Amino acid sequence: MEEPRHSKRPRFLAPNQASGGPPTEPGCSGVDREDPVDPVQPAKPTAYVKPMRREPPARAQPAPPAGRGQRGGGSWRAGRGRGSGAGLLRALGERVGPGMYLVHLNDHGELGYQGQLEARQTPAFSFTEAALMPGIVQEGPGPHAAQPEVGLQEPPPAPGPVAVARQTMLAPSPSLSFRPPGGSSTLCIVQTSNSTIVQSVPVFPAHSAH
């Protein structure tokens, strides 16, 4: 009787069989198989985009309005002031401060020139200058020397627009009066908040007896 031949091929045992553990299932090798490697996937496509800069459309500046000509026949030059009529104010009026212009109006409420202004304020001057005027105050003692009289006096009435402006004053204004020697009138100088008024007041015989 022949003995069964043993295969000469080396037989690999699983670790659990070598240590006496239960045999592994058929078809399963003792070596742990690695996870199947996924095929190399193509990378995501890269898009090269050129950035475009969007600029707002430029505003079209309106043409300057055509105005009346100046006295010399020229055209008005549009200014760069805040308002639309800044150039007109700069051309018509006189500058009284930063960004401020004094514009004269005629009787109809229209823009006029400085020559059309009927009443203008007289420049104010101090009483010291009035006292140094020649022919009014005489130096040296004498009974007939002009004696200044300082007091409060209402401004003399005046016709026209100046009288309307003076009606707004509520308090009397300081005044300075001079009577020249041998003269028939008294020079009154009234200082107001807006201007200085100089007026000659006639002296009647009843007042000259003082």
Swiss-Prot record:
Biased composition (Gly residues): 69-82
Biased composition (Basic residues): 1-11
Top-rank taxon, per record: Eukaryota
Positions of the UniProt region annotated as Disordered: 1-82
Family matches, as Pfam families: PRR20
Similarity annotation: Belongs to the PRR20 family.
Protein name: Proline-rich protein 20G
